[in-house]
Amino acid sequence: NMVACQVAHTIFNTPVKIARIRHQPYLDPIYGDLYSPDQLPIDHIISPEAEVSAAVSNQLRVPGAFDVKDMCGGRMNLVGVQCSEVSPIIDTPIRHLTNLFPDLSMTILAVIRDGKLTLPRDGAEMMKPGDRVYFVCDSEHLDRAMATFAHEEHEARSVLIAGGGAIGQMLATEIETNFQNTKVHLIERNASRAHFLAENLRETRIFNGDALDSSILAEADVGTTETFVAVTDDDEVNILSALLAKRNGAAHAVALVNIPGFIPLVAALGVDAVINPSQITVSSIL
């Protein structure tokens, strides 16, 4: 990918070059000068692992949502949320929301009901319990916007991660660095990798074992976990461990799923949020 950008620049004079780079050492800030017109002419770098880690991090900040995206440099948020039966906006025409909440900067973009997408063009549509709704709002109004859907969950204070690969390590590092007073536990099946993580993660407690083993989940305090995140390299393990974690007491479960056909099934099974690396990478490029 890096060489392809060089060829596009040198031979074809392509104005914008975007490269997917997965090998994490290439992303170290000390090599920032490497990506310049005089060196490797890459304008934008996409790291699938970093993008997935950021997506999960957003889920931890807004646990009531199934999808969260930052926009305009973090000044706005695009959020996907499921309507609760006790939401105050149930059976209210969308165009009336401005009258009900005049100080709330929020726009409903789409409503998904029974797998069918509806764009509320005239504002006459009404939301029903179980609808999956996408809206955009000012970041400072996010908590109030979530409250209108009866979601007032606080930022996760205890997180259990299944999978200690690149994504799991980056997510644990992100939580250690940017989440205050959040307890992090991580389950990794490979013993040598678990030792590596234990040596490199300062505040994360590492458990060597199988995330599908109920005894390991219990040892990792799954019963008191607010958010369980499954980011192994196996879709089946991610889905099943997320369901097992919820059955054993985890309040919220997020699963990494690579196979697109699995995504609608996972939500129906009871997993709260699904992260798809391909969708996230394409979204980042766009």
Would you name each region that the model predicts?
Residues 1-286:
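Cytosolic regulatory regions of ion transport systems
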